[in-house]
């Protein structure tokens, strides 16, 4: 039995100054049974959605089960700002972790959406930082999931003129960019 030791910025709670709480996540080795269960779940779900999708499973260097989906009309699978893809990923994670001991992380992607979204968010962060510097007023972004908020925080963490923090409760939690004092 092999496992990968990983320090993650993922967090269920954030402390008052919004610094991410580091926690250790043990990723278990992905079993063939888990791969089969997740693959079957996705194929059945996508078939029920009336979609023709090819699924490619791979194990990332960090030990995550990475699943890339391809086919026509993948925009439907992505959904508004990736919400459908995120929901399907959540369900795939539940299926994977039901079928084995130890934690398995499942990452779903299609048409390189995750990388494109990350670039879009980094670009948005830089534009908002420029706007905050120019107008000298804080700017609150739209509500985002924890993964997307983390991208915004990371993109601006080395900016000497602005700071970021999150406000609100899930699912309406958003990043606020303010001028440093």
Show which residues each predicted segment covers.
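RNA-contacting regions in translation and RNA-metabolism proteins
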Residues: 1-181
């Amino acid at each position: 039995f092999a496992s990968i030791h990983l320090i993650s910025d993922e967090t269920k709670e954030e402390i008052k100054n919004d610094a991410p709480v580091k926690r250790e996540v043990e990723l278990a080795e992905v079993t063939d049974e888990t791969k089969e269960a997740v693959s079957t779940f996705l194929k059945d779900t996508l078939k029920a959605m009336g979609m023709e999708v090819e699924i490619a499973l791979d194990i990332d260097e960090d030990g995550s089960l990475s699943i890339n989906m391809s086919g026509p009309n993948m925009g439907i699978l992505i959904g508004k700002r990736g919400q459908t893809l995120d929901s399907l990923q959540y369900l795939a994670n539940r299926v994977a972790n039901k079928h084995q001991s130890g934690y398995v992380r499942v990452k779903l992607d299609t048409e390189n959406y995750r990388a494109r979204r990350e670039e879009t968010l980094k670009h948005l962060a830089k534009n908002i930082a420029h706007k905050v510097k120019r107008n000298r007023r804080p700017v609150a972004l739209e509500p985002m999931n924890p993964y997307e908020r983390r991208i915004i925080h990371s993109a601006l963490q080395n900016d000497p003129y602005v700071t970021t923090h999150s406000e609100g409760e899930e699912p309406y939690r958003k990043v606020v960019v303010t001028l440093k004092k």
